[in-house]
């Protein structure tokens, strides 16, 4: 072969390679991920090493699903919480969009929901939290029910139910392992996830008589935003005022608690007694001074862990459940050109000189979870109520 042909062959090869990359619609979003990690990840050395290793990875993706798989497989190499990839149309994308709606400048965030948090496990999809007064609760779905199918098709995610919004929909569930499946009719609705969590928090508010004590309870599926803290503060001063103790459910969901959350339990604030002209005494306190139980598990993360760590350290609460996630970094959502979201850890966080990332917070009373086929039972909550009742001083 003539030596004069070599430059032409090399040029043609280079053009083919360039053309192959240009033809891939996933090269650009892949490069966006790499650039964000390189320039914004909280650990610059790890970020640079990861970015160098994965430069151009998007070009090999053959579909949006394949790109998502490749990205989700690569990000864990950074070994950091608050670092994940959420494609459009997924529950995580909707949740993060709702939490950071103002930051992302989104005019509206609405997704299908049945009013339940569904967990995917090796055994299948199980109802982890059934939000009080929601469509699933009204239809009879219980914690621990396994979701088998929707309108005869295998269940994949609630986010995929767009075509069933406002339509009575047949959900086939398995309540007991090996038992005959049951069909529930649930009507999915469009909701803003953050608004749904706030409604669920309010609906969960109750005071129960337990072992001779009045124990208050509220679920904070998410703590992201002042509305959630305000909702708890309102309950502590109103619905819970005559309760003897309180259980705050921090399990699963999202973090986001502001450090000012701790002010709700500041015992340095004095208690007052108003005395009327008839001599009647009316005790009042601006903060909660009675026993507190924080119910946590391996998915209690971020701001919830900061609150749990601090309240335990100061003797303000007893922790019941399971060791927390150890996911305490500051993260920010970054929108890619595809509309997908990259959630990236951008700062480390110390709490009183302690790094909780990768460490978490141990509980005072360990209670294993028992989700699959629970038939509505919740042993962790039962134990939390026991501990709260036992913490009330004798009259």
Q: Across the structure, where does each feature detected by a protein language model lie?
A:
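Bacterial N-terminal signal peptides
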Residues: 8-17
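Cleft-lining beta-strand/loop regions that shape enzyme active-site pockets
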Residues: 165-337, 372-374, 389, 394
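Boundary at the C-terminal end of the N-terminal hydrophobic targeting segment
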Residues: 20-22
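Bacterial N-terminal signal peptides that target proteins for export
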Residues: 1-9
């Amino acid at each position: 072969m003539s030596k004069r042909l070599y430059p032409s062959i090399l040029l043609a090869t280079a053009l083919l390679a360039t053309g192959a990359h240009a033809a891939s619609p996933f090269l650009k979003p892949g490069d966006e991920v790499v650039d964000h990690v390189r320039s914004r990840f909280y650990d610059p050395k790890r970020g640079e090493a990861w970015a160098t290793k994965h430069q151009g990875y998007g070009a090999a993706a053959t579909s949006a699903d394949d790109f998502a798989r490749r990205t989700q497989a690569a990000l864990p190499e950074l070994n950091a919480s608050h670092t994940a990839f959420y494609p459009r149309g997924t529950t995580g994308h909707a949740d993060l969009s709702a939490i950071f709606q103002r930051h992302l400048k989104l005019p509206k965030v609405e997704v299908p929901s049945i009013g339940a948090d569904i967990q995917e496990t090796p055994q299948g999809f199980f109802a982890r939290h059934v939000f009080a007064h929601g469509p699933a609760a009204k239809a009879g779905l219980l914690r621990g029910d396994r979701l088998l199918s929707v309108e005869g098709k295998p269940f994949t995610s609630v986010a995929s139910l767009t075509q069933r919004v406002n339509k009575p929909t047949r959900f086939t569930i398995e309540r007991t392992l090996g038992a005959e499946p049951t069909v529930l009719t649930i009507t999915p609705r469009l909701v803003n996830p953050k608004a749904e969590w706030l409604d669920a928090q309010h609906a969960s508010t109750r005071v129960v008589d337990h072992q001779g004590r009045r124990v208050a309870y509220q679920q904070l599926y998410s703590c992201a935003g002042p509305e959630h803290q305000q909702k708890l503060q309102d309950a502590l001063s109103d619905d819970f005022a005559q309760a003897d103790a309180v259980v705050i459910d921090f399990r699963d969901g999202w973090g986001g608690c502001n450090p000012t959350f701790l002010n709700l339990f500041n015992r340095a604030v004095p208690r007052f007694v108003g005395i009327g002209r008839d001599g009647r005494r009316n005790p009042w306190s601006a903060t909660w001074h009675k026993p507190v139980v924080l119910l946590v598990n391996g998915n209690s993360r971020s701001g919830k862990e900061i609150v749990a760590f601090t309240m335990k350290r100061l003797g303000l609460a007893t922790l019941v459940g399971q060791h927390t996630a150890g996911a305490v970094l500051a993260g920010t959502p970054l929108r890619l050109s595809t509309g997908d979201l990259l959630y990236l850890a951008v700062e480390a966080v110390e709490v009183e000189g302690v790094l909780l990332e990768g460490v978490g917070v141990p509980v005072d009373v360990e209670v294993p979870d028992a989700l699959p086929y629970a038939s509505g039972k919740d042993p962790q909550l039962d134990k939390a109520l026991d501990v709260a009742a036992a913490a009330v001083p004798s009259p």
